[in-house]
């Protein structure tokens, strides 16, 4: 691993960024990996590498899948990690997208291999995406936490220092490895209501993508995702209404959430939303 280099103060135009998400412990509701899949589609990403699953996975934990083609031939699909690359339409920046399953073993070697691919594409900033189950109501905006081990990024991008202590997943290990490697590193975490933690969770995916858009200063086409998020919330509303105990629990979560928040929206949040609106408007005109 290379010697640590001074981290830049912010992702600079023209310098590559790696965004990564992993199925498993770090991916409540499938929200983080769904965000990577969405970016892969809207940015027209091209596959550039697959990691050998033999090195990192216990196939009794993550079993391969057998599929049948139209000609009846059997194919085995192995659990693996895939790397794609894309060029952002507005800034021209190169982005690497990483999607995989949290490995069963050799996490340090796994991170080193991902960072070798990052070096090949001149990646300066590594952004890990995650989602966790939390005591939050589905009727309120999805809480999103952004943390960084890179001091220069904390003030520039309005992210918090990394303060968590306790068990971690591959997201935390990769974030730390990236910082040790000399990359700026940021971790984005969405809080998914624990009582509806099964995939999909489009409202949480939408929250993650909005923060990615802010981070890269690049409009992200959302397609049907906003409508999917509304439909998801409506569906949960209907389910909660059928069970008085769940409905009361949701009301308690709403009261706790509303009490904890400031009575007025923060200036930073308003500014971010306005900047996002301008980027999408300009992108629509240029398109």
Predicted regions and their residues:
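Conserved active-site and cofactor/substrate-binding residues in soluble primary-metabolism enzymes
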Residues: 27-34, 105, 109, 165, ...
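Short beta-strand segments
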Residues: 20-21, 99-100, 128-130, 189-191
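Catalytic cores of processing enzymes, dominated by hydrolases/peptidases
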Residues: 135-219
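N-terminal short beta-loop-beta anion/metal-coordinating cradle
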Residues: 1-100
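A conserved C-terminal secondary-structure "cap"
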Residues: 196-287
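Flexible, glycine/proline-enriched loop segments at strand-loop-helix junctions
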Residues: 22-26, 97-107, 157-165, 195-199
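Internal, conserved structured core segments that host functional sites
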Residues: 93, 100-152, 174
């Amino acid at each position: 691993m290379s010697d640590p280099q001074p981290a830049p103060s912010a992702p600079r135009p023209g310098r590559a960024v790696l965004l990564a998400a992993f199925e498993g412990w770090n991916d409540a509701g499938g929200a983080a990996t769904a965000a990577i899949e969405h970016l892969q589609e809207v940015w027209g990403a091209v596959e550039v590498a697959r990691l050998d699953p033999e090195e990192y996975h216990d196939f009794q934990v993550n079993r391969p899948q057998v599929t049948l083609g139209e000609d009846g031939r059997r194919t085995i699909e192995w659990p693996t990690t895939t790397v794609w690359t894309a060029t952002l339409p507005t800034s021209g920046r190169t982005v690497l997208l990483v999607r995989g399953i949290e490995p069963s073993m050799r996490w340090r070697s796994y991170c080193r291999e991902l960072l070798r691919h990052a070096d090949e594409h001149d990646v300066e900033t590594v952004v890990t995406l995650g989602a966790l189950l939390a005591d939050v109501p589905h009727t309120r905006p999805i809480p999103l936490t952004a943390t960084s081990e890179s001091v220069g990024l904390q003030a520039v991008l309005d992210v918090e220092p990394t303060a968590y202590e306790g068990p971690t997943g591959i997201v935390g290990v990769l974030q730390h490895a990236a910082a040790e490697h000399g990359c700026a590193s940021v971790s984005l975490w969405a809080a998914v209501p624990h009582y509806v933690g099964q995939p999909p969770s489009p409202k949480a995916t939408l929250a993650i993508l909005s923060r990615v858009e802010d981070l890269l200063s690049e409009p992200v086409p959302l397609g049907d995702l906003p409508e999917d998020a509304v439909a998801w919330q409506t569906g949960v509303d209907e389910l909660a209404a059928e069970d008085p105990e769940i409905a009361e629990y949701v009301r308690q979560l709403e009261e706790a959430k509303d009490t904890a928040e400031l009575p007025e929206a923060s200036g930073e949040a308003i500014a971010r939303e306005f900047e996002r609106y301008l980027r999408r408007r300009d992108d629509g005109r240029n398109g």
